[in-house]
Structure formats: C-alpha cells, structure tokens
Curated annotation (Swiss-Prot):
The lineage of its organism: Bacteria, Pseudomonadati, Pseudomonadota, Gammaproteobacteria, Enterobacterales. PANTHER family: FERRIC ENTEROBACTIN TRANSPORT SYSTEM PERMEASE PROTEIN, VITAMIN B12 IMPORT SYSTEM PERMEASE PROTEIN BTUC. GO terms for cellular component: plasma membrane. Part of the ABC transporter complex BtuCDF involved in vitamin B12 import. Involved in the translocation of the substrate across the membrane. It comes from Escherichia coli O139:H28 (strain E24377A / ETEC). CDD domains: TM_ABC_iron-siderophores_like (cd06550). The chain crosses the membrane at residues 15-35, 61-81, 88-108, 112-132, 146-166, 184-204, 240-260, 274-294, 302-322. The complex is composed of two ATP-binding proteins (BtuD), two transmembrane proteins (BtuC) and a solute-binding protein (BtuF). This is Vitamin B12 import system permease protein BtuC.
Length: 326
C-alpha cells in the first residue's frame, strides 16, 4: 500500500512538472509569436520593447490568468455539483456578466471606458452569484441549486438576445465580438482585473481538503464533518468572482472549464491537491496555445478565441473519452 501511494505521489509530481514545462513553453511562444517573430534575444531591443513588453506581455498574462481561472472554476463546479458536465457557464454566472457588459455598452452608447465595462461585467456576475447564494440559504439540494443556475443562465441568455436584436450596427459588432471571446483589446490598463484574479486563484488551490470531501458526495461530506452550507456559499461566490473578472477581460470563452478538469481526471489526477494546480497550469497552457492560433491563423484578422478553443478542443476531448471507455 505504501509503495502504491509513493508511486502515485511520484506520478502526480511528474504530471505537475510536465504541465509546468508546457505552460512555460506556451508562455514563451506567446511572447515570441505574432505578425513579427521576436526571439528572446531581441526582447530588449527597441522593437522588442514595443511589441513584447507593451503589447504581448499584458495580453499573455491575461490569457494565462483567465485560462487558469476558467479551468479551476470548472473543477470546483464539477466537485460541488457532482456533475462532470458542470462548467462556469452552467450556473448562469457567465451570462450574468454578459448582461452587465451588454447593458453598459447599450446604455453608455459605446462611450464608456474599458474599466467601466469591466466593472459592469463583474457586477452582473456578482448579482447572479448573490441570487444563487440566496437560493443556497434556503438549503436547497445541490441538484436543485444546479437547476436554479441553469434557469438563471437561460433568462440572461434571453436578455442578451433581446439586447442584440434591438442594438445599432456599431453596438452589435462590439457585442457579437465579445460573445465569441477575444483578448485583442487587453493592455496594461486592464492590469487591475488581472490582479483581482490572483488572490482567489491562490486561495482555491489551497482548499484541496474540502474539495476532496465534496467530491465524495453530500452525504459523505456531512458524515466527515464538512460544513456543507458554508463551503457551498464560499465556493459559489469565489467561482462567480473569477468568472466575472474573466468575462470582463476576454468575453465569453467556452470549453476550458468543461474539458480541462475532465481530461486531467481521465489522466489519473483525481486528488484535488494535484487536480487544482494541474487545472491552473493546463488551463493556462491550453488558452495560451489557442490565443497563438487565433492570432496567426489569418493574416489580416484575428479569430475569436472561443471558436478556436471549441474547434481544437472538442476532437481531443472525444478521443480521450473513447480511449477511456475501452
């Protein structure tokens, strides 16, 4: 038994090391790649100072943090709701952030600064989170809370559809680009949003013990002495914050929160002491690579990153599911 535990521990360490190396390589590629390839030796030249430090670095950091936040949010939701299909958009938090951002665009007639749009997106996500917490205080079961989140997401989606239908052509273009996700407008002015993600990310990565209990199911978690009501509220609030900030930075990005935790579990990373940091590393790597593809796929334009993540990730996910089912 001790030998098996040591083997599993070594395997987990190898996985984390491999994911760390992958993230560093993806980070390096993201800083080098673009309309002009700039190797690390040229980063401190006048050209590198402009393209790398002023344009690519803030975008790369935003992609890294959003990828980590979405993947960790997916892992938390899948444990909290005991559902492998749970992901950040399932509770309606992503759509709530979208409603806040769309309201800001329409009411501000496209004149509001980026920081105001970001605050409105976070406010929309937190409003949906507060509604979910109110449901949770009624001691609803996890399945009922999940259904409540789905219903809120449908309502928010309907509101966004109505807003797009009645918007002007200029607003419509901005809204449609946001709904497909993208980091094209990110620069150092959004650094406050990036900083808002870091404390919550680090805190959740340290909560492996309650997450492991939650993954066993509600009944087992209660028997082990976990204050289920408290942890459900705290984790829903933390997830709402991360998703709201991510939407404010990059818009709606699917796939990452659903597939990354699932892929790591299929690879044997089931302990949340390893799964949570693994999700952060893998989510950041996947979104960095998708962002590079989005930038380089077309010569004269940039692809929406949400389209890239779905196109590249879905076949890999299906292959892993088929492989695991044999």
């Amino acid at each position: 038994m001790l030998t098996l535990a040591r083997q599993q521990q070594r395997q987990n360490i190898r996985w984390l090391l491999c994911l760390s190396v992958l993230m560093l390589l993806a980070l390096l590629l993201s800083l080098c790649a673009g309309e002009q390839w700039i190797s690390p030796g040229d980063w401190f030249s006048p050209r590198g100072e402009l393209f790398v430090w002023q344009i690519r670095l803030p975008r790369t950091l935003a992609v890294l943090l959003v990828g980590a936040a979405l993947a960790i949010s997916g892992a938390v939701m899948q444990a909290l709701f005991e559902n492998p299909l749970a992901e950040p958009g399932l509770l309606g938090v992503s759509n709530g952030a979208g409603v806040g951002l769309i309201a800001a665009v329409l009411l501000g007639q496209g004149q509001l600064p980026n920081w105001a749009l970001g605050l409105c997106a976070i406010a929309g996500a937190l409003i949906i989170t507060l509604i979910l917490l109110r449901f949770a205080r009624r001691h609803l079961s996890t399945s009922r809370l999940l259904l409540a989140g789905v219903a809120l997401g449908i309502i928010c989606s309907a509101l966004m559809t109505w807003a797009i239908y009645f918007s002007t052509s200029v607003d419509l273009r901005q809204l449609m680009y946001w709904m497909m996700g993208g980091f094209g407008g990110v620069d150092w002015r959004q650094s406050w949003l990036m900083l808002a993600l870091i404390p919550v990310l680090l805190w959740i990565c340290c909560q492996s013990r309650p997450m492991n209990m939650l993954a066993l199911g509600e009944i087992s978690a209660r028997q082990l002495g976990l204050p289920l009501w408290f942890w459900r509220n705290v984790l829903v609030a933390a997830t709402g914050w991360m998703v709201g900030v991510s939407v404010a930075l990059a818009g709606a990005i699917g796939f990452i929160g659903l597939v990354i935790p699932h892929i790591l579990r299929l690879c044997g990373l089931t302990d949340h002491r390893v799964l949570l940091p693994g999700c952060a590393l893998a989510g950041a790597s996947a979104l960095l690579l998708a962002d590079v593809v989005a930038r380089l796929a077309l010569a004269a334009a940039e692809l929406p990153i949400g389209v890239v993540t779905a196109t590249l990730g879905a076949p890999v996910f299906i292959w892993l599911l088929l492989k695991a089912g044999r």
